[in-house]
Regions:
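Internal alpha-helical scaffold of NAD(P)-dependent oxidoreductase catalytic cores
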Residues: 1-68, 95
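Solvent-exposed, non-transmembrane amphipathic alpha-helical segments
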Residues: 19-23, 30, 75, 79-83, ...
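Interdomain hinge/lid region at the active-site interface
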Residues: 60-127
């Protein structure tokens, strides 16, 4: 009933798959919310007074691309293999004690994106290795 109320299509999920189904939806909805909150904290720390105004269009576009294009819809420095930008992001996040949690999430999510892109053959080994190295030593 809740799915229909939210505009979704009901689906029958086998009993043995219900926890996995719920884990998948929780993974998406909860982590999008958490990353969005962290995004707002980073923007606020950068002096942006209304972070939602700046974040909303980009976040909505990224979600739409992910839903329609899958892994191919991932963009940004990890997808480009831009180790220099990744290192700059890691440095500025590390420099702010208030953003320690965001720094950890950034590193974890960059590694996860790199793994997805590598598996989909959208990022070559050399670029992926450079991105991961930039997270380990952002001063390099």
């Amino acid at each position: 009933a809740l799915v229909v109320e939210m505009g979704g299509e009901p689906v029958v999920v086998a009993e043995e798959d219900r926890a996995l189904y719920h884990a998948g939806l929780s993974h998406g909805a909860n982590f999008i919310a958490g990353i969005t909150v962290q995004t707002m904290r980073i923007l606020t720390e950068a002096g942006i007074s209304d972070p939602a105004l700046y974040a909303r269009p980009l976040l909505e576009a990224a979600l739409d691309r992910a839903l329609t294009e899958g892994t191919a819809g991932i963009s940004g420095p990890a997808a480009r293999g831009d180790a220099g930008t990744i290192a700059a992001h890691a440095r500025c996040l590390s420099a702010r004690d208030a953003l320690a949690g965001e720094r950890n999430t950034y590193a974890d999510m960059t590694r996860a994106l790199t793994r997805l892109l590598r598996e989909a053959r959208l990022l070559d080994e050399r670029a992926a290795t450079a991105v991961e190295a930039a997270l380990l030593d952002p001063g390099a």
